[in-house]
Amino acid sequence: MGKNIVVLGAQWGDEGKGKIVDLLTERAKYVVRYQGGHNAGHTLISKGKKTVLHLIPSGILRNNTINIIGNGVVLEPHALIKEIKELEMQGVPVRNRLLLSAACPLILPYHVALDNEREKARGSKAIGTTGRGIGPAYEDKVARRALRLGDLFNQITFESQLKEVIEYHNFQLVHYYKAEPVHYQRVVESIWGIADILKNMVIDVTQVLSQAREKAENLLFEGAQGTFLDIDHGTYPYVTSSNTTAGSVATGAGFGPLYIDYILGIVKAYSTRVGAGPFPTELNDETGNFLRDKGHEYGATTGRSRRTGWLDAVSLRQAIQMNSLSGLCMTKLDVLDGLKTVKICVRYKRTDGTETMSTPITSAEWAEVEPIYEALPGWKESTFGIKEKSQLPQTALNYIKRVEELTGVPVDIISTGPDREETIILRHPFDEMIKK
């Protein structure tokens, strides 16, 4: 019987999802992206060879895996073609392994222009977007004026709709932001060659996944970003423009929620965040710099340095509840090697002196909380590359056990290095049929 699992980030993104998805795809027939866009950056390392993906699912390097980009993903066609060609130069037959939903909203030049002009206008209050047009593209989708991938294949209708939408957005660009307009003809000329390349990959994703499930194939749904960047449940407004929680598998891939067997939350052994927004356990000190440097905490998409801090069990518990996580995968355990003391945030303290074990909702409430830490002994021994739980230092095992106690969820996978082989699998998601 086939199993259907979801892999998603339980923090603010950059948890190491790409490596874990790449590892688990050995057992998956289909790997599906269901939200986000090319603002994601998933890094895969196998036998020392590094591959960075932004749009294409992380199963693309596997010979027998079919990779799908679902309708919940906003698609920048030029970025997709670039990624396809880069992989093909490495000998990966992408066009034989990749399928696309006809319902994917397109990211077009006016979305990028709006994204950048808005960030400029915000000044010191900038959200810290990647500037790739993700938010404006989702806005058009909700406003029912988006051009979708399937629209590309009817030239007359597409050009008519495109002209109308460009006029709409140019009014804002020119008259509000005092910026240059986007030229209709240039957009048209740049898009038509791409339509021919992508046409044979376009499918009805819901039907393909339904047939795969009926054939008892293993399906893996790959999330982008992280739980606390969710447009509804994240640290709003410092969030992305899509739903990053497990529920978006249903809306972003057309796959019924009752068919999901296991949901794996990826969590670093510490915390990181890119860009502005609340981060209660942030460390602006020597320890923070240690975590950043040793963990190579620089974005795969933007190259920006990440903010670093201790593991936050308060937000992690919230992520477990929102996503109904079956188990956790703890990544970058090896980064904590050598620290005399490691800390976990177990509660928040408000400015009025009261304590809470819940995450705030508003920005004002987030600004008022401070972390209450529990300190545990660190370990001097190296955990890098360890593949057996029995080889881990006892203090590292105690740290993992304490995380399990604080969250009520087992740590099923431990990552001790960037390569897919540098992993301890205690319970394989495809071996379990757990529903919560």
UniProtKB/Swiss-Prot annotation:
Provide the GO MF annotations for this entry.
adenylosuccinate synthase activity; GTP binding; magnesium ion binding
Pathway field: Purine metabolism; AMP biosynthesis via de novo pathway; AMP from IMP: step 1/2
Q: Which UniProt keywords apply?
A: Cytoplasm, GTP-binding, Ligase, Magnesium, Metal-binding, Nucleotide-binding, Purine biosynthesis
Residues annotated as binding IMP: D14, E15, G16, K17, N39, A40, G41, H42, T130, R144, Q225, T240, R304
From the UniProt record, list the reaction(s) this protein catalyses.
IMP + L-aspartate + GTP = N(6)-(1,2-dicarboxyethyl)-AMP + GDP + phosphate + 2 H(+)
- Tell me which Gene Ontology terms the entry assigns under biological process: 'de novo' AMP biosynthetic process; IMP metabolic process
> Which Pfam family, any one of them, does this sequence belong to?
Adenylsucc_synt
Disulfide partners: none
InterPro entries tied to this protein = Adenylosuccin_syn_GTP-bd (IPR018220), Adenylosuccin_syn_Lys_AS (IPR033128), Adenylosuccinate_synth_dom1 (IPR042109), Adenylosuccinate_synth_dom2 (IPR042110), Adenylosuccinate_synth_dom3 (IPR042111), Adenylosuccinate_synthetase (IPR001114), P-loop_NTPase (IPR027417)
In this chain, GTP is annotated as bound at 13-19, 41-43, 306, 332-334, 415-417
Glycosyltransferase as a keyword of this entry, yes or no, is no
- Active site, UniProt feature: D14 (proton acceptor), H42 (proton donor)
Respond yes or no to whether keyword Ligase is given for this record: yes
The UniProt record gives the binding positions of Mg(2+) as: D14, G41
Q: What is its main location?
A: cytoplasm
Q: Where in the cell is it found?
A: Cytoplasm
Cofactor requirement: Mg(2+)
Cofactor details (free text): Binds 1 Mg(2+) ion per subunit.
Its EC number is: 6.3.4.4
Q: What does this protein do?
A: Plays an important role in the de novo pathway of purine nucleotide biosynthesis. Catalyzes the first committed step in the biosynthesis of AMP from IMP.
The record's HAMAP family line, in alphabetical order, gives: Adenylosucc_synth (MF_00011)
Homology family: Belongs to the adenylosuccinate synthetase family.
Q: What is the recorded name of this protein? A: Adenylosuccinate synthetase
Organism for this UniProt entry: Hamiltonella defensa subsp. Acyrthosiphon pisum (strain 5AT)
Q: Which gene encodes it?
A: purA
